Amino acid sequence: MIQSHVPVMLNEMLEALSPKDGESYLDCTFGAGGYSKAILESCNCYVTALDRDPNVIKRAEEIQQNYGERFDFVETNFADSFAKLKEKKFDGIVLDLGVSSMQLDIADRGFSFLHDGPLDMRMSGQGLSAEEFVNTAEEKELADVIYKYGDESFSRRIAKRIVEYRKTARIDSTGKLAEIVRSSIGFRKGKIDPATKTFQAIRIYVNDELGELEQFLVNVKNILKKDGRLVVVSFHSLEDRIVKNFFKENSEKPVVRSKYAKDDMTIDPNKWLKIITNKALASSDKEVGLNIRARSAKLRAAKAIYE
């Protein structure tokens, strides 16, 4: 069953994407369908949605029943989507890089430290699971992953405790891992749960989320029409840095060769984006008050000035 999910920065996403009648849009991270549905309801447009999680197919079918040929779903991760999209181009593309509530709230998915369940964390159910990683990785690798992807200053202490624990028993549940992390750091009431950063780090590593994002951005020019908009909502400083650097590296004002000849200009064909958001937009205090998962969200948007 799909749990209730509140899309983050929904209004800001729609404003940046600016959907129009007759145009086609790509939702790279379908999840519970919040963005796709909002885009479809905003005007008489078309949406193609992607997701590698087979558990969202039922929700996609529900939306397809309501919107017919205006909606299409493809089961794939967005980095591998280019072949399946068959050279189709879009007027706008949106990525929500966060984990949806339906994934966090279902214990069997193994994403959440709030719900005890199998230690899995795989979006697609394939590849290395969190359980395999936690129980087989060397202490240094564990510490490096937790530090790099979780910004966790206690990463070495946590990694040491994990290795000590697994000498006596296998770490096979989210509850066990959460308690190991909490016992390593200490848990002060009212503060963010100490397990937050470690769980985030392992999830990002297991699903190669940063690698997938980088691979997609390298190829996104091939599927975005001229004047098409690219909107990315990220939840981690490393994700935001990748997006920020990509926008910066691919957007630049035309270079004037001579200060006396305004028409003597060159345009670098690799600088194909115009940044819409001068700096990352953050969730409003009101939204964070209603949805705590919005607290770390950042939105960046850019427009293709030519193909």
Curated annotation (Swiss-Prot):
Its main location: cytoplasm. CDD domains: AdoMet_MTases (cd02440). Its EC number is 2.1.1.199. GO terms for molecular function: rRNA (cytosine-N4-)-methyltransferase activity. It is an enzyme of class 2 (transferase). The keyword Disulfide bond does not apply. It is found in: Cytoplasm. S-adenosyl-L-methionine binds at residues 33-35, 51, 82, 96, 103. Keywords: Cytoplasm, Methyltransferase, rRNA processing, S-adenosyl-L-methionine, Transferase. One of its GO terms (biological process) is rRNA base methylation. It catalyses: cytidine(1402) in 16S rRNA + S-adenosyl-L-methionine = N(4)-methylcytidine(1402) in 16S rRNA + S-adenosyl-L-homocysteine + H(+). It comes from the Bacteria. Gene3D superfamilies: Putative methyltransferase TM0872, insert domain, Vaccinia Virus protein VP39. GO terms for cellular component: cytoplasm. Coiled coil: none annotated. Specifically methylates the N4 position of cytidine in position 1402 (C1402) of 16S rRNA. HAMAP family: 16SrRNA_methyltr_H. Belongs to the methyltransferase superfamily. RsmH family. NCBIfam families: 16S rRNA (cytosine(1402)-N(4))-methyltransferase RsmH. This is Ribosomal RNA small subunit methyltransferase H. It comes from Rickettsia massiliae (strain Mtu5). The gene is rsmH.
